């Protein structure tokens, strides 16, 4: 939480099924980091144990086998993964090819720079079929889809509705 407050990173957590198992602080950070305005955890600091709030809002991606705790799942856009079968042939990531991703990184940064005013002023319609928390979860991605345009606004909203329906089944 101190790192999040100071550097405002994007949090990428792999092996979440083992990492979160007995890590109450991490679950609190994930749960508390859902809303930009109210996202904070309180911790005592210094020799006097003075209570201090730490902001914990940050974009987060959590990869894991299985489902997270209900409170984490309710604050998430869940994309279910499955364990790779022994017969599946997957090309591993080669660190030396990392440089191939830099042009994409630069294009995304440029796109954001060119569109940040539109994104900040966008008040996207979210699918009414979603519950209130799910609507909060998808609002930013709907704004991005609206600014991108084309088929993306409709495609994205339909995908969110289908994900919500699958979760209810």
Question: What are these model-predicted stretches?
Answer:
Residues 1, 14, 49-50:
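Aromatic/His-enriched, Gly/Pro-containing loop or helix-boundary segments
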Residues 1-10, 40-41:
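Short glycine-rich substrate-engagement loop in P-loop NTPases that contacts/grips substrate
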Residues 2-5, 21, 52-54:
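Short, charge-rich binding segments
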Residues 10-33, 65-74:
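Conserved AAA+/SF3 P-loop NTPase catalytic/coupling segment centered on the Walker-B
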Residues 12-14, 41-45, 54-65, 78-80:
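Structural recognition of the conserved hydrophobic beta-strand(s) that form the central parallel beta-sheet
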Residues 25-52:
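Conserved catalytic/switch belt of AAA+ P-loop NTPases
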Residues 52-56, 65-169:
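Phosphate-sensing "switch" segment of ASCE/P-loop ATPases
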